[in-house]
């Protein structure tokens, strides 16, 4: 709470979790009177990784905060991703809405949300971005996969951002790619008045360093 107070009073621009329980920090951030989350803002998590076999940075959300995002929360997640991509110099981010298949089905309510989001994007709601889905991870990030499946998408296997349907898939992706693909990672909480670095206990020192660098890039 003392660190949150310092940020609120202008004494710091970035908040980083140390050796404390994550819940304690989140409670301080979410405090309605003395916290850091403005009224009406959504608290979520955005990560970015550099994978040796991918030709660009890859952002993704949410691997840490929202169990099952609502449509409005997904829209906010996309806006956070857009603003962060612009901080990294990506003027027209390609955002892929992730599912296990490219088919829309009422059995998977998030796929219905995706249809609404794509329609908003096509109407210009998000500005200069490319959004498509549902798509699976491989079709989102590998051009040949879409060609083999006969899937035509403006993402064209060159996604900058992956929006996952729930925290289980996002978190599994986060840990799998860092473990098996030797990816370098960084991540921040999105929504508070300042960047919040929330490292996992198993994150490497380099990952924490990259997260601090990401916070500096996105700092207002």
State where each predicted segment sits.
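Anion-binding alpha/beta catalytic cores of soluble intermediary-metabolism enzymes, centered on
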Residues: 1-155, 160-220
């Amino acid at each position: 709470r003392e660190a949150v107070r310092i940020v609120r009073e202008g004494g710091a621009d970035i908040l980083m979790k140390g050796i404390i329980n994550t819940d304690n920090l989140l409670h301080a951030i979410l405090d309605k009177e003395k916290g850091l989350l403005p009224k009406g803002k959504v608290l979520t998590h955005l990560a970015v990784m550099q994978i040796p076999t991918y030709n660009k940075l890859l952002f993704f959300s949410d691997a840490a905060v929202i169990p099952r995002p609502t449509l409005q929360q997904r829209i906010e997640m996309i806006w956070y991703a857009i603003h962060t991509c612009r901080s990294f110099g990506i003027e027209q981010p390609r955002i892929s809405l992730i599912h296990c298949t490219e088919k829309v089905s009422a059995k998977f309510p998030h796929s219905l949300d995706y249809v609404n989001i794509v329609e908003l994007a096509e109407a210009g709601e998000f500005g200069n971005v490319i959004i498509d889905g549902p798509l699976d991870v491989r079709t989102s990030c590998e051009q040949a996969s879409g060609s083999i499946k006969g899937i035509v998408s403006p993402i064209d296997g060159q996604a900058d951002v992956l929006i996952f349907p729930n925290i289980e898939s996002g978190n599994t992706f986060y840990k799998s790619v860092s473990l098996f693909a030797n990816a370098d990672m960084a991540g921040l909480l999105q929504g508070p008045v300042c960047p919040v670095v929330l490292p996992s206990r198993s994150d490497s020192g380099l990952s924490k360093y990259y997260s601090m660098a990401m916070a500096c890039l996105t700092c207002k």
